[in-house]
Amino acid sequence: MATLHETHTVWDHSITPIHEVEPGATVELEVRDASGGQLDRDSTAADVAALDFARVNPVTGPVFVRGAQPGDTLAVEILELRPRDWGWTAIIPGFGLLADEFPDPWLRISKVEEEARRVAFADGITLPFEPFPGTIGVALPEPGEHSVVPPSVWGGNMDVKHLRAGTTLFLPVGVEGALFSVGDTHAAMGDGEVCGTAVEAPMDIVVRLSVRRDMTISAPQYHVAAGDLARTEAGSHHVTTGVGPDLMEAARDATRAMIGHLGSRYGLDREEAYALCSVACDLRIHEVVDVPNWVVGMFLPETIMGGRA
């Protein structure tokens, strides 16, 4: 099976497909990291400041699935993800949940250990290796170029960490052939990806593409196999909360509180704590019905801090 590697940086249904397959075919695609190759093992924060944003978030594709028509559903079975041995996490000026509080570029290079199923993020902090594609979707029916950065009902940069091997993603088809693409692979991420990046890592991904005409959807859905939740789910957690009438502000408050906890309990500086929130901590909405306030929690899996206890 040949590995596909041609990329594009916008959604545009006029882009010529790089490959055509029959429904049910298995496809292997080479995914570049979210910087589009601008960052590597030897990069520094200065390289983050110099990023060319026209080159970020490349996706590999598009793949034309024969027979797929608007109104159909494309089933994407994620079969395998194979990483390289490194990844990066950055604080990018102007980007992230607390962008106004973290104005300076910051970079961390992590070691990805596929066989051990772990990511060495910092001294004494080890994350589970749980790879998935952050950006995955099909072409929009609207003409012209569309940014890959915001997600849409056609998929895109959804950053759903449960889209791991064993999960099936269902996408509405908007154009003939679906025009499937994938990119932005991550070695680890917390729900919310609050600093704007995960452990960004180049990988090869293998998927099976099928057409479902018995299923009509208006936005992405996915099926997670039994027992395929994060390995940290069963361990102990420390949880901070944000409470208030604005969901975004509640999320910001919960994140600020976790940054404070990581500093006072484990001695992390603010930048490292913010980045750790992004790659390992999960934001969750606890409560929505008791107006006027929302309750948002941020969950720290304490098992990852074993070397800092």
List where the protein language model places each region.
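Short, Lys/Arg- and Gly-enriched loop/turn segments at beta-strand edges
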Residues: 34-45, 81-91, 177-187, 286-289
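A generic structural signal for residues embedded in beta-strands
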Residues: 29, 73-76, 171
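Loop/turn positions that initiate beta-strands
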Residues: 24, 68-71, 166
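N-terminal, Lys/Arg-enriched amphipathic/low-complexity engagement segments
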Residues: 1-51
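Intrinsically disordered, low-complexity linker/loop segments enriched in Gly/Pro
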Residues: 80-165, 170
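Short, structured beta-strand/loop micro-motifs enriched in basic residues and often containing a Trp
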Residues: 2-13, 52-60, 146-154
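Conserved mixed alpha/beta catalytic, RNA-binding, or beta-rich assembly cores of soluble enzyme
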Residues: 129-133, 137-157, 161-247
